[in-house]
Amino acid sequence: VISHDKPINIFEETTGHMPKASIQTMLLGRPLATADAPHQTIGKLIGLAVFSSDAMSSVAYGPQEMMLILAFAGAGALHLALPIVFAIAALLLILTFSYEQTIHAYPGGGGAYIVARDNLGELPAQTAGAALLTDYILTVAVSISSGVAQLVSAYPLLFPYRVWVAVSMILLIMVINLRGVKESGFTFAIPTYFFLVLMFATVIFGFIRYFTGNLGVVVNPPSMGIDYIQPLSIFLILRAFANGTTSLTGVEAISNGITAFKEPRSTNAGRTLIWMSIILGSLLLGITFLSVHIHALPSESETIISQLVRTIYNGRGLFYILNISATTVILIMAANTAFADFPRLGALHAGDGFLPRQLTFKGSRLVYSGGIVALALIASLLVIGFQASVTKLIPLYAIGVFLSFTLSQTGMAKRWWKAGHLKKDEEIVEPGSIVRFDKGWVHKMLINGLGALSTALVMTIFAVTKFKDGAWVVIILTPLLVTIFFSIHHHYKNLAKQLSLENHPTPKRIIRNRVIMPVSGVHVGTVAALQFASTLSNDVTVVHISIDPKETQKIKDKWELWGDGYRLVVLDSPYRLFLEPLLEYIDKISAIQAPNEIITIVVPQFIPKHWWTNLLHM
């Protein structure tokens, strides 16, 4: 039992220290105090831009990648894109209802990780987290690569430089996000709404031309670049459906980012989700319908969007340039959704001890800087490795997010089951929320259950049809990441157990402190270090590793003058090793120390005035 007979003195004060002006503050803005955090939230309009740009921008590549697969059966098979896109819209409707319930059940943030952790356990939670983290990285790579593809459609001369253009865009978004969520929200709102206005205007004008009978078809369509025609099969249709479902990968972003919204958070986030789904569904249906009727052909050299816009506006005039520019920008902005959610999810994992704790630290602008920089770095490596090709990246995409969809919806279905079997005055307190009796639990459980079954089916289709194309990488990577997460968690648990004061006996009073101080020579620094060591104990041993007999003799001579009576131990090292003889000596002293003794190692360090001169002393 620890005695408390001594007075406890705890003093607390707030320091007024602010980081000094630097290149970082010039790029990122003035540092924000922790008290500024409540003011760094956003409303529905900004929230729609920040968290929906990923989903909205997918209309630029979702229909294209779906039609690209159908094109393997010949241009005549492209009409099947219409029933496929209606099936995707139905799936979007199911997901919207499912995630709207999640948002209200988890007002503190209801991503797949939290829902799975609270309702299914740690293994499903880490699986969902690994899948989502992987998907966010791929979101950045795919969105930026698709944005560059739009740019190349308008300016073919940029094709050889597409990889470095993509990497530059990723770094630009990284810097913007390091400035903070509020500033990045305002930055991204204008181009997002600019894209929506132009795209809806284009679709509406296209339908007007269609219904008046003067829409026409694509003039000078690009080559599809397909060497041979395959027979139309169920497997091919399922592959096209799997590619098209990549348009739904951004649906979960709002439920992950609830804490970024102003109060009432759940209401604002829920309404934003509904508006996002309406906009996404409308654009998906409209763009696919018009693309099929103008006989647009999927191609690496020109995107479906480019063909659609130039057909509707009769050429590459002002409206074409505006639409392609807006599409390019929204695809770049889509990567911002991942930059908003990846650091938060990483911080959640780190807070639970499954990722390095450094990811929980907020930078000078109240954002998780470590997560933002890590995301930019890994996504850039992916873009370089896959040469900024959307077609090559797509097979890796979506399987992870549909796995997280499935786990999230399964967790929610289990939550409603628990809620339905509670008494009216009962509640279960979980880390992410509080479960109370809900009279509508059956209805809600069925909605989330349907969502889980639907997304599990899509995930299976994607895994089977895209396995050879690259889905196998994600299938292997996800359990590997989960293994790494649990290894990190095991380390933190062991460390916490070792450091725990629970059941810890009263510390024994130290009766002796032995000080060992290694030195390379006798000079002003050595004398100062010796004076410091002598304040710790009267038992000070200075150790010199001898690799040059002449230098050692000089040190002995100086020690007689400056050693102040303290002992000097010289360890000869015939093979010029330094660390090993020193550690061996420390082990020898440790072996003979008494129970109430401690050993302190004092290591004098030379700190040069200029950082670059460190290279001269290594």
Spans of model-derived segments:
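Loop-to-transmembrane helix boundary motifs in multi-pass membrane proteins
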Residues: 122, 160-167, 260-282, 350-384, ...
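C-terminal membrane-solvent junction of multi-pass transporters and transport-like membrane proteins
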Residues: 222, 358-369, 407-459, 464-467, ...
